[in-house]
A protein has these predicted regions:
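Bacterial N-terminal signal peptides
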Residues: 9-18
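Bacterial N-terminal signal peptides that target proteins for export
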Residues: 1-10
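A residue-level marker of the well-folded mature domains of exported/periplasmic proteins
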Residues: 6, 20-336
């Protein structure tokens, strides 16, 4: 992946540097035939398909039995029945992208009481619900970076909106918090956040919400959509609109979803990490926990296959790495 443009504000040192004298699992083998289950936010989201494919690839490498189960809608209540079934099946570990930070805690605690290891990826629960959280990148950097990209495109002036996923999505709300903090800085004094809309990580609703934003705010200059479903739906709407090229759209998208919109001029830049690597890293963390090689404590290190040695940071967080910014110059170098 040459010539990638990285947002430099994202600190990844904490995921790569040994933080203490806690145990090192580097030379400890992973148990064979572990049962690892992966519960994405929803199973029909293209991003989640890529993410869990990475998880299953890791399972194949380490000789684990991996499976993906989950709801078709991105709600916490819909994830509960799957978690309960996996507890009954006595999985060794459950890897979860949470649709709510708190609603799933009682069920995850029940799983942990049954000695099932819990790892969250992509979207976290409160720390008491799991041992390790695989974070895509620094949450602060993700939020700040999207504001910075948009601000440059609109010359730091004008009304902007955010098109999010669901109102309770942990990762979305954390990133939005950092966006709002970034917008308080003096350089953004001429920018105004007029609305946060929610497309519920559904393509058609996100498409309709984009239309609604543009109708409600005729002076809108830009939209940030920190969800792969939302940013692709917004781009699809703008691509056939008279506002194509006049409204700046940035957010988090996959290159394969966004390629046509970059090439036709609808979108100049967007950002993401490799979702497959998120799932891959989460599977290795789950397997190391289930093997008794790590406990999720700050400073522990573990081997994560092709991703090398990783260190657990504060509150059990492991950061994958920095964001990559995609544009017309580099998008064809990526295929996911």
């Amino acid at each position: 992946m040459t010539k990638t443009s990285l947002i430099t504000t994202i600190a990844v040192v904490c995921s790569l540097t040994f933080l203490g004298t806690v145990g090192d699992s580097q030379d400890k083998p992973i148990k064979k035939d572990l049962k690892l289950a992966f519960v994405p936010k929803n199973v029909n989201n293209p991003y989640n398909v890529i993410e869990t494919k990475g998880s299953l690839d890791a399972c194949q490498e380490i000789g684990a039995q991996g499976k993906v189960v989950g709801p078709s809608d991105a709600s916490a209540s819909s994830q509960v029945s799957y978690i309960n079934t996996l507890i009954t099946q006595r999985q060794n570990a459950i890897v979860l992208a949470a649709n709510d930070p708190n609603a799933l805690i009682p069920y995850l605690k029940r799983a942990r009481e049954q000695k099932i290891q819990i790892v969250t990826m992509d979207s976290d629960t409160a720390p008491e619900g799991r041992k390790v959280f695989i974070n895509q990148a620094s949450s602060e950097g993700i939020g700040q970076g999207q504001v910075q990209i948009l601000a440059k495109q609109i010359d730091f002036k004008g009304e902007i909106a955010i098109l999010s996923a669901t109102p309770n999505a942990t990762n979305q709300n954390t990133w939005i918090k950092y966006m709002e903090e970034e917008l308080q800085k003096p350089e953004y004094k001429d920018m105004k956040l007029v609305r946060i809309a929610y497309g519920n990580d559904e393509d058609q609703k996100s498409f309709t919400e984009t239309q609604g934003l543009l109708e409600a705010y005729p002076n809108l200059k830009g939209i940030i959509s920190p969800t792969t479903v939302g940013v692709a739906a917004a781009a699809r709407y703008l691509s056939t609109s008279p506002l194509k090229g006049k409204i700046a759209l940035v957010g988090l998208g996959t290159p394969n979803q966004m390629r046509q919109f970059v090439k036709d001029g609808t979108v100049k830049e967007f950002a993401l990490w490799n979702p497959s690597d998120v799932g891959y890293l989460a599977a290795y963390a789950a397997a190391q926990l289930a093997s008794g090689n790590i406990e999720g404590k700050e400073g522990e290190t573990f081997s994560a296959g092709k991703l090398g040695s990783r260190t657990i940071g504060k509150d059990g967080v492991v950061i994958l790495g920095p964001l990559t910014v995609f544009d017309a110059a580099n998008i064809d170098q990526f295929n996911f």
